[in-house]
């Protein structure tokens, strides 16, 4: 888990540095294509790598069949994207998008090569090997791309180069580390065995992937590609806390929840504690991002990106509900109900798309507000689904949310008043810190008791993550 966060941190830092050299338009050009590449990568795997990990006895035929299947699907998908690239360019009306599409899709095939050797490393619990392959690959990709940006003044082509190198280097690393020699053969029995497990999870991931990237498509179509660039970088910044910390806590708590999910009383107490830890930290953090959005953009990306500020404000507010939604999704997954995950994803994303499309019919200016409404509804749907699996009613969950949301709202109001009243950061930041301490002290008044125990649990989770 920590290796994943470390490599993602390098990628994030590098992308933020690139933003000082590369225009929002170039980032937006890549952003509108993200959905096609991400969906392709989900389809290539089809959940079968998880099956390879799950199976106790695997044969060389299983590995060869999976490798051949992945390569075949990846080539098919690349050819499909290659053929559709002129139509994609016509839809978005972005010059040279067809060429970019053909080049940025190359990692689809490259990533397919690495699935089997990487899965074998995971199955062998060689997490240190995975970390070093990813870490070194990211460093090499960043250094080579950085040289091309600074010395040769590459811009859009530098982004294309980076995404290709970030796929090529790990694939080479996994193959060399495992000394994996692929065989091009396929056995129906192996495919049938591997394909059965994880199909619900895969379909759910596809639905979520389409939805998570659909805003880039709509913004690129109904606004312009520059706005996609602003949106994509704001989204990248918003996901630093909302995704990374949430993934850390949920990822480390998931195995624990799986071990004793039949003891309903213990399970409900544990998920209540996890939510108190996560929400008490993350909700005020997202509200601080809302307040300091413009300053964060200027500091991290530069003044050329200041128009990304309003995107960051709205995405940070939506991020609060995404955190709640993803937490409940982890709980449903830990109960072994991948079928429920699929159906809730279909319902949530269908409603979300309807709301977003309706907002476009009114005005494209309401696009992100529609996304916020859809995020709140999605969180409520996941909460309702969890209430059907456990004696843990929707009202009980809403009460738990309010125990963090209400004090966080007071925290937001006070910090916002301070921000708008004080001009110097030397006074503003210490006062904000004092307000944060008061927020923690007052949490027991709202039902979040034993703060020290909650922080202790959080530290234990972080230590567990380091072992991964």
Give short role names for the model-derived ranges.
Residues 11, 41-60, 122-123, 234, ...:
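Helix-loop junctions and terminal segments of transmembrane helices
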Residues 51-60, 110-133, 147, 178, ...:
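Membrane-interface junctions at transmembrane-helix termini in multi-pass inner-membrane proteins
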Residues 1-48, 73-87, 137-142, 146, ...:
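Signature of the first transmembrane helix
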Residues 68-93, 143-147, 271-323, 353-361, ...:
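Alpha-helical transmembrane segments of multi-pass membrane transport and lipid-handling proteins
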Residues 98, 102-105, 132-179, 197, ...:
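Hydrophobic alpha-helical transmembrane segments
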Residues 128, 156, 160, 172-213, ...:
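Interhelical loop/hinge segments that connect adjacent transmembrane helices in multipass membrane
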Residues 2-11, 137, 159-174, 189-259, ...:
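Transmembrane helical elements of multi-pass membrane transporters/channels
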Residues 387, 392-394, 402, 413-468:
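Membrane-proximal transmembrane or re-entrant/amphipathic helices at the cytosolic face
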């Amino acid at each position: 888990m920590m290796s994943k966060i470390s490599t993602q941190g390098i990628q994030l830092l590098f992308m933020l540095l690139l933003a000082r050299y590369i225009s929002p338009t170039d980032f937006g050009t890549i952003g509108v294509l993200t959905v096609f590449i991400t969906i392709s990568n989900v389809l290539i795997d089809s959940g079968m790598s998880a099956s390879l990990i799950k199976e106790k006895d695997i044969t060389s035929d299983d590995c060869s069949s999976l490798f051949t299947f992945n390569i075949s699907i990846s080539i098919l998908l690349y050819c499909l994207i290659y053929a559709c690239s002129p139509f994609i360019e016509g839809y978005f009306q972005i010059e040279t998008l067809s060429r970019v599409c053909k080049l940025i899709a190359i990692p689809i095939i490259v990533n397919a090569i690495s699935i089997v050797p990487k899965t074998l490393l995971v199955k062998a619990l060689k997490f240190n090997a995975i970390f070093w392959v990813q870490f070194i690959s990211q460093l090499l990709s960043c250094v080579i791309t950085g040289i091309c940006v600074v010395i040769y003044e590459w811009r859009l082509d530098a982004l294309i180069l980076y995404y290709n190198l970030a796929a090529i280097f790990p694939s080479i690393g996994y193959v060399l580390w495992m000394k994996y020699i692929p065989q091009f053969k396929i056995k129906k029995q192996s495919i049938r065995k591997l394909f059965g497990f994880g199909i619900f999870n895969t379909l759910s991931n596809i639905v979520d992937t389409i939805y998570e990237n659909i805003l880039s498509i709509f913004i690129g179509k109904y606004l312009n590609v520059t706005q996609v660039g602003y949106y994509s970088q704001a989204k990248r910044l918003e996901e630093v806390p909302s995704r990374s910390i949430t993934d850390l806590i949920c990822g480390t708590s998931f195995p624990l929840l799986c071990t004793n999910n039949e003891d309903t009383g213990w399970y409900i107490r544990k998920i209540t504690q996890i939510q108190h830890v996560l929400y008490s930290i993350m909700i005020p953090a997202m509200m601080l991002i809302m307040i300091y959005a413009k300053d964060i953009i200027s500091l991290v990306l530069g003044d050329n990106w200041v128009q990304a500020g309003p995107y960051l404000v709205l995405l940070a507010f939506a991020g609060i509900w995404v955190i709640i939604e993803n937490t409940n999704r982890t709980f449903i997954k830990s109960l072994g109900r991948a079928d429920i995950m699929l159906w809730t994803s279909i319902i949530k994303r269908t409603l979300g798309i309807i709301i977003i499309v309706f907002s476009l019919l009114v005005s494209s200016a309401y696009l992100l507000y529609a996304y916020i409404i859809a995020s709140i509804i999605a969180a409520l749907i996941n909460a309702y689904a969890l209430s059907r699996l456990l004696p843990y009613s929707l009202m009980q969950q809403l009460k738990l949310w309010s125990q963090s949301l209400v004090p966080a709202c007071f925290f937001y109001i006070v910090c916002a008043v301070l921000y708008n009243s004080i001009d110097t950061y030397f006074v503003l930041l210490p006062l904000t810190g004092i307000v944060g301490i008061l927020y923690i002290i007052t949490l027991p008044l709202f039902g979040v008791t034993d703060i020290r125990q909650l922080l202790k649990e959080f530290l234990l989770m972080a230590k567990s993550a380091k072992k991964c």
